[in-house]
UniProtKB/Swiss-Prot annotation:
MF term (GO), any: RNA endonuclease activity
GO biological process per UniProt: rRNA processing
Enzyme Commission identifier(s): 3.1.-.-
Family, as annotated: Belongs to the endoribonuclease YbeY family.
The species this protein was found in: Ehrlichia ruminantium (strain Welgevonden)
Family annotation (HAMAP family): Endoribonucl_YbeY (MF_00009)
Entry GO CC: cytoplasm
Official protein name in the record: Endoribonuclease YbeY
Function description: Single strand-specific metallo-endoribonuclease involved in late-stage 70S ribosome quality control and in maturation of the 3' terminus of the 16S rRNA.
SUPFAM superfamilies: Metalloproteases ('zincins'), catalytic domain (SSF55486)
Amino acid sequence: MIEINVYYKKWYSTIKKPKIFVKNVIKSSLINLNIYEYKPIISIVLANNILLQKLNYEYRNKNKPTNVLSFPYDKLNKKCNLGEIFLSLDTLIQESIDLNIPIEHHTCHMLIHGLLHILDYNHEEPLMQYIMESIEIKLLDKLGIRNPYVSRETIYP
């Protein structure tokens, strides 16, 4: 089950039908990762810089906003609670402008990035970064979105 909370109402004027948009991205990713049949519980909060900065400081001791934060809970198994993903629309908009890409594409990328984190992927070491980025690229391609790493350095919170 995918639970979506629109904490920051500006999401409605930026992404058309944000709850459906997010649900489709996560569902597609779970299907392509061959784990949709597990029916995991995933909570997604569509937020802003104020909330993400607060959470980033509280949990990572970084007093600044970020694009995505993930909080993994259970390991993958039937109907487990995989975790929560928080997105900041403010940061995503600014990064989309800086990267000259559609906000929808960048939002898809950061949703997938957050999903992979709650599935225990990370980018702390070069090999893990390569694996994680490779999966992101494949999942984005399934959504018709080009490789975000072609002409830029990676963006990580």
